[in-house]
Amino acid sequence: MILDADYITEDGKPVIRVFKKEKGEFKIDYDRDFEPYIYALLKDDSAIEDIKKITAERHGTTVRVTRAERVKKKFLGRPVEVWKLYFTHPQDVPAIRDKIREHPAVVDIYEYDIPFAKRYLIDRGLIPMEGDEELRMLAFDIETLYHEGEEFGEGPILMISYADEEGARVITWKNIDLPYVESVSTEKEMIKRFLKVIQEKDPDVLITYNGDNFDFAYLKKRSEMLGVKFILGRDGSEPKIQRMGDRFAVEVKGRIHFDLYPVIRRTINLPTYTLETVYEPVFGQPKEKVYAEEIARAWESGEGLERVARYSMEDAKATYELGKEFFPMEAQLSRLVGQSLWDVSRSSTGNLVEWFLLRKAYERNDVAPNKPDERELARRTESYAGGYVKEPEKGLWENIVYLDYKSLYPSIIITHNVSPDTLNREGCREYDVAPQVGHRFCKDFPGFIPSLLGDLLEERQKVKKKMKATVDPIERKLLDYRQRAIKILANSYYGYYAYANARWYCRECAESVTAWGRQYIETTMREIEEKFGFKVLYADTDGFFATIPGADAETVKNKAKEFLNYINPRLPGLLELEYEGFYRRGFFVTKKKYAVIDEEDKITTRGLEIVRRDWSEIAKETQARVLEAILKHGDVEEAVRIVKEVTEKLSRHEVPPEKLVIYEQITRDLRSYRATGPHVAVAKRLAARGIKIRPGTVISYIVLKGPGRVGDRAIPFDEFDPAKHRYDAEYYIENQVLPAVERILRAFGYRKEDLRYQKTKQAGLGAWLKPKT
């Protein structure tokens, strides 16, 4: 199993290293025969001798083309002959490429920016993560001491915790009497002990949570300050910290550094991405949070260190569990794309598609287009019409079906052969013409991207069939990871066409796909309304909610299935409309904002959720009760009564203060905040009292009644004393409870002022409620 690849330099020449796991043992394969190269398209092939004479300087060494060969390739589906120019060292390419490009005989140069080790994996047909080797995994986490205003890495590391299949342990330099704690004498000894643990356990995978941007950099800085060689690589090297966009990325040679943070941000939509806020939705169990100021207080006083050690241990354990959960999926993406898991786990979906296309282009003898320069990038910012959205029918509706197109955009790309190499191509016998925009796509041959996409969808269907057939739960889970990885890639192609930095960028392709999408959804809606008696309540891009007013549930379900039998044979190619669900009740507020309830009383909402931590418990609880009243009981008036009851209790100060706590995270150094929100104001007052506040600290506060700005009246919740303090009921009514329910009840004709307990006026309710069956 290939873990990763890189290159080193020996005697001025590159040596490829392939890090592998074979039969349970780690090994490194070396290849000294692979040469860096680029392609050049010439106006006149006789100019090749002049091209070979071009020189440049790199670190005092003269750089030139070492040899050249003429090769037959394809470019965007058309035959082309190009020159393959070889060089001594990969770093020669950036030193000389502009000089070659500027030669009058050169039309352009290609594939000059593909990293050497990645080029090697593609050209040699090597696929990382293939095989059934069992990889050893170890997760680690650190706790640090931070004082406001300190430079990064100035405060000591207090604890290093780690977890693997044998359990979780904590290394620290204070005596803590717990069975999983190992105490050493100093911070320096703690770091050295951790390095020894890595050496002894020799993991193939190091799992962190934001290790790219915190743990590794902090450990490396403290190691330098303390005179410790921070060697973690299997080749005896220190971790390599490199910039990747606006973030950092850390490589450990011979080991996969699997940072969960970018993976989870790409995979799950959450309001915040702390370890605690991620762990609960993934595993369904809360994880305790110990705040930075509590850690500092415990460390400096010596009281409560057991709790901090337990928290540190549980951090490592949670990171390990999350790593085990997410690693198999990234391994499948790595296999699918053909690049290392280290790269894949830090890539956007657009980059995943691009690496997949680069490999397939090589396999099909295609020269890849270049990435855009700054001028071209600016030109690619022009927008175009997106998917169709029908404004929702207001009111409370019953017996609703949801129908949507199966993989709408991928199906359109394949069915209509939408690809840069088929776009407006002259001399074809047959074209598909996109509605509204008029772009033509040749149907005489399969386009590069539609053919690859078709292969992916076909493979996914085969994998899903295997899933159904197997009785082995482990095999089924692995197959499920595989089909999900394929789905991620397949669903990214439309977005890739519109991705400004893409090699195979095609605005005409993207706007043609959405134009066909609009046509199909609008035609389908018209057919179901005119021929089957449905009323479409809301539609968005690839699906719609519909009902038959006055009909019972069985009638609506049966008629929907009749419609599918009618419409699907009339759709071209891979286009297929599916029955996605039935809901006994629902309402639709505005675009992308609705709530429905199924026959098992499961409520699904979109655009109405208040899951951010800066909503108090009373706001979340009130919204949940309002949704239940409307959807479960079909009673909008009950929902209004609930809101009035809550606002009345708030006004009378009958709501427990615990339900009014607001949590907000400090995301940067306090000195860099210009706007002082309540959480920042509270944090600054805490810091002034000596409590350590750092980025990531979550501030819990409650707003008191009184004059002045909200920030001046917000206090830490643990300082709230019911005997001395009164919370600001008006603040919680106007800024928490009413905003949480107003957009829901507005759909039924209620205004904000109608929802407070002292007002009883109802605005036009009868016009909004639909008859129940």
Curated annotation (Swiss-Prot):
Mg(2+) 1 binds at D141, D315. Residues 1-131 are annotated as: N-terminal domain. One of its GO terms (molecular function) is DNA-directed DNA polymerase activity. Mg(2+) 2 binds at D141, E143, D315. Its EC number is 2.7.7.7. PANTHER family: DNA POLYMERASE CATALYTIC SUBUNIT (PTHR10322), DNA POLYMERASE DELTA CATALYTIC SUBUNIT (PTHR10322:SF23). This is DNA polymerase. It comes from Desulfurococcus sp. (strain Tok).
